[in-house]
Amino acid sequence: MFRNYTDSVQEMVLRAIDSIRDSVINASSAVSTTTLPPLDIPMTSMKPPSIIPTVELVLGTITYLVIIAMTVVGNTLVVVAVFSYRPLKKVQNYFLVSLAASDLAVAIFVMPLHVVTFLAGGKWLLGVTVCQFFTTADILLCTSSILNLCAIALDRYWAIHNPINYAQKRTTKFVCIVIVIVWILSMLISVPPIIGWNNWQENMMEDSCGLSTEKAFVVFSAAGSFFLPLLVMVVVYVKIFISARQRIRTNRGRSALMRIQNAEGDDDYRKMSIKRASVESARTSSRVGEKTPLVIADGQTTVTTLAAHSTDGGSLPKDETTKHMKYHNNGSCKVKVKDVKEDEGNPNPTAVLRKREKISVAKEKRAAKTIAVIIFVFSFCWLPFFVAYVIRPFCETCKLHAKVEQAFTWLGYINSSLNPFLYGILNLEFRRAFKKILCPKAVLEQRRRRMSAQP
């Protein structure tokens, strides 16, 4: 019964595709009789689409729909978060908006047509005009997604390598210009087949719709869409990683130097503190009756004194030994020296430096892991497709199975669904924004509890 149901669904889809194809062909033929020359691409040699096995049809359709849904939801959240959550309204996040827009367009205009082709048994039944639109949009949107990733990498590199100058240069106008350049380059790579740099007539002799296999265009588009951006991303992220490692070593060197200086200065500091206490206690003023406590602490030994007629109004932090002071009416005072433990409120500078060093190292390790994940995911998703894309025109016998080719194509599309997670969810501010968008009641409740817990 289930098999009959799926077969009937597939037959309904095929009939709908046939009607759409007929309308497109009629429209294109009507236009060609008035303005354009007719297309010399025979569509009569189409073979009837093969019937996909039931399990493959169901699992494949569900998988593709899940990928589309993840891409749409994830990238929509990124766009909404940047424009609605105040901490994310930063000019550098416009690169993420451009990336999300291109990935969202891939999910809306490109992926569904692949699903239709899959339901039709791997046959293209939508006509030549739709095929040309489909292949052009595919190249344009996927290239813009990849080039946006490259722009994000360059933005991070400039921000780390030359932070002062780039902070002044990174304005809204500058970022928008870079984004426009990304989309113009994507158009320059995707438009040539439309103006004649193609061999579509050879590819569309049968019921299929594929990218142009013209050798020069394949090399040009593969280099501009993937291999050059990949090279830029690898070089830039490696430089970022090296810069981070150098910063860690520099911080460690400074910490070690400050520890040595701190250790050498301990004895001198204690002597100066005691001497200063004796000097300050001897000072008097004409302002009779003014009492100013003077407490000097060095972390190991505390010297406490009181000058009844002091001209200095300053005091260092009070210590618990102040209650043991004794003073006389003639302006003199007794000084008690008492060994105390290190004040918990004033930790050792060396410990503070070590703590900061650990935090810095942890941040740099997380950044390095993020860089490694970004490069790995990008290469893993797109490298198989572009390797097969480049080899195909130069090796006629190296023909991939249709299912393998389809898997490579969808693996590249998966990158568009993973980008929101890599560039958004790994960021704490984006996680907070997503939580605020998806669970506003939980965020309000958490804020109320936090406010009620405060004294």
From Swiss-Prot:
Gene3D superfamilies: Rhodopsin 7-helix transmembrane proteins
GO biological processes: G protein-coupled dopamine receptor signaling pathway; octopamine or tyramine signaling pathway
Keyword Membrane: yes
Sites carrying sugar chains: N4, N26
Membrane topology: Multi-pass membrane protein
One GO CC term, this protein: plasma membrane
The keyword GTP-binding is annotated on this UniProt entry: no
Observed effect of gene inactivation: A loss-of-function mutation does not affect the development of AIY interneurons, or lead to egg-laying or any other behavioral defects.
Coiled-coil ranges (or none): none
GO MF term (any one): G protein-coupled amine receptor activity
Disulfide pattern: C131-C209
Tissues where the protein occurs: The different isoforms are expressed in specific, but overlapping sets of sensory, inter- and motor neurons, including AIY, AIZ and RIA interneurons. They are also expressed in pharyngeal cells, head muscles and excretory gland cells.
Positions in the Extracellular compartment: 1-60, 116-133, 198-221, 393-407
Keywords: Cell membrane, Disulfide bond, G-protein coupled receptor, Glycoprotein, Membrane, Receptor, Transducer, Transmembrane, Transmembrane helix
InterPro entries documented for this protein: GPCR_Rhodpsn (IPR000276), GPCR_Rhodpsn_7TM (IPR017452), Octopmn_rcpt (IPR002002)
Cytoplasmic topological domain residue ranges: 84-93, 155-174, 244-370, 429-455
Compartments in which it is found: Cell membrane
Regions crossing the membrane: 61-83, 94-115, 134-154, 175-197, 222-243, 371-392, 408-428
PANTHER family: ADRENERGIC RECEPTOR-RELATED G-PROTEIN COUPLED RECEPTOR, TYRAMINE_OCTOPAMINE RECEPTOR
Family per similarity comment: Belongs to the G-protein coupled receptor 1 family.
Described function: G-protein coupled receptor for tyramine, a known neurotransmitter and neuromodulator and direct precursor of octopamine. The rank order of potency is tyramine > octopamine > dopamine > serotonin > epinephrine = norepinephrine.
Protein name: Tyramine receptor Ser-2
Native species: Caenorhabditis elegans
Gene name linked to the record: ser-2
